[in-house]
UniProtKB/Swiss-Prot annotation:
InterPro entries: PLipase_A2, PLipase_A2_dom, PLipase_A2_dom_sf, PLipase_A2_His_AS. It holds the Pfam family Phospholip_A2_1. Its EC number is 3.1.1.4. Snake venom phospholipase A2 (PLA2) that exhibits an indirect hemolytic activity, a low myotoxicity, and induces edema. In addition, this enzyme has been shown to induce the release of some pro- and anti-inflammatory cytokines from human PBMC (IL12B, TNF-alpha, IL1B and IL6 but not variation has been observed for IL-8 and IL-10). PLA2 catalyzes the calcium-dependent hydrolysis of the 2-acyl groups in 3-sn-phosphoglycerides. The active site is at residue 47. Disulfide bonds join 28-44. Ca(2+) binds at residues 27, 29, 31, 48. This is Acidic phospholipase A2. Transmembrane segments: none annotated. Keywords: Calcium, Cytolysis, Disulfide bond, Hemolysis, Hydrolase, Lipid degradation, Lipid metabolism, Metal-binding, Myotoxin, Secreted, Toxin. It comes from Bothrops leucurus (Whitetail lancehead). Monomer. Gene3D superfamilies: Phospholipase A2 domain.
């Protein structure tokens, strides 16, 4: 879940860690479009695709 993902980020990076990802790259935060900018952004892309499986999103 998004809540668990946020908890993991805060655990690794500290309490404000999740705030750093609200507008990171193309896919971290709300929405997304284009190609992921790096491995971290790709992780956010894959996370978004998990929730979008019903629309046929394929993160390969």
């Amino acid at each position: 879940s998004l809540w668990q993902f946020g908890k993991m980020i805060n655990y690794v990076m500290g309490e404000s860690g999740v705030l750093q990802y609200l507008s990171y790259g193309c896919y971290c935060g709300l929405g997304g479009q284009g190609q992921p900018t790096d491995a971290t952004d790709r992780c956010c892309f894959v996370h978004d695709c998990c929730y979008g499986k019903v629309t046929g999103c394929d993160p390969k």
